[in-house]
Amino acid sequence: MAVSGIGGVFFRAKDPDALLEWYRTHFGVTMEGYEPWQQAAGPTVFMPFASNTDHWPEAKQWMINFRVEALDEFLSKLRQAGIDVKTDPAWDAPETGRFARIQDPEGNPIELWEPPVE
């Protein structure tokens, strides 16, 4: 028997309400009480990294990755909102897609992923 998907992502925040509002504003993640956010079906990568990875800041134990469509348009909106966006052509590959990285207001690392078109 196997699990059928990820049912939630839970993490500590200094100001949970303000951080949830940031995710609602910039990512469309809506939570009302414990009413789940409905997301589009798609691939999910579950992968431990070596403890000395430089894929995200050492002070953080995790990084969340969000699937997005039209990455360039999404990044443009984030930049217009004053969010620092990092891209690197070395992160992108035809077989895996395109990537960008940002941090939320509390410094949590976020990777944005536009999967390859099939």
Q: Each predicted region: which residue ranges?
A:
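Conserved short beta-strand elements that form part of the metal-binding/catalytic scaffold
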Residues: 27-62, 102-105, 109-116
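Helix N-cap motif at beta-to-alpha junctions
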Residues: 14-16, 69-71
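Short hydrophobic/aromatic beta-strand micro-patches
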Residues: 10-12, 65-67
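Vicinal oxygen chelate
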Residues: 1-5, 11, 32, 75-118
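Secondary-structure boundary/capping motif
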Residues: 18-20, 63, 99
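Short amphipathic alpha-helical segments
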Residues: 5-7, 60-64
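Amphipathic alpha-helical segments
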Residues: 15-29
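Short amphipathic alpha-helices within nucleic acid-binding modules
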Residues: 22, 72-77
